[in-house]
């Protein structure tokens, strides 16, 4: 343990000597280049007053950069919302249809069952009326065939 401590001390002393030599060399090199030490290595903060016109121009430039991006994001958001609304309407109709099927299954197959309509267009309602009329006509024909 004493040996490793001695070796550590020797290594530390050599590092300190090497660092001292490096500092001396830097000082010598720095003397040749006063510009480097006086200007480049010194940090200065410069505060300047900016005119109101320049400030407004900078704001307008930022707005001109950001506005197209915001508009694009808004249009994407609107498209996504429309898509989700259509999907919600489809799911609502599917839910109503499945609810109707479940109610019909639970009620059994007795007589006429009431038709529950969700959101329908006039075209769909017209087709439904035509289908009911065809059904009634076919039932009459079946009754006539059985009667004869």
From Swiss-Prot:
Presence of keyword Disulfide bond: no
A Gene Ontology molecular function term of the record: microtubule plus-end binding
Coiled coil stretches, renumbered: 68-148
Record's keyword annotation contains Nuclease: no
Record-linked Pfam families: DASH_Spc19
One GO cellular component term noted in the UniProt record for this chain: spindle microtubule
Compartment(s) of residence: Nucleus; Cytoplasm, Cytoskeleton, Spindle; Chromosome, Centromere, Kinetochore
Location, primary (coarse class): nucleus
One BP term from GO: positive regulation of attachment of spindle microtubules to kinetochore
Keywords: Cell cycle, Cell division, Centromere, Chromosome, Chromosome partition, Coiled coil, Cytoplasm, Cytoskeleton, Kinetochore, Microtubule, Mitosis, Nucleus
Function of the molecule: Component of the DASH complex that connects microtubules with kinetochores and couples microtubule depolymerisation to chromosome movement; it is involved in retrieving kinetochores to the spindle poles before their re-orientation on the spindle in early mitosis and allows microtubule depolymerization to pull chromosomes apart and resist detachment during anaphase.
Family: Belongs to the DASH complex SPC19 family.
Subunit structure: Component of the DASH complex consisting of ASK1, DAD1, DAD2, DAD3, DAD4, DAM1, DUO1, HSK3, SPC19 and SPC34, with a stoichiometry of one copy of each subunit per complex. Multiple DASH complexes oligomerize to form a ring that encircles spindle microtubules and organizes the rod-like NDC80 complexes of the outer kinetochore. DASH complex oligomerization strengthens microtubule attachments. On cytoplasmic microtubules, DASH complexes appear to form patches instead of rings.
Name of the protein in question: DASH complex subunit SPC19
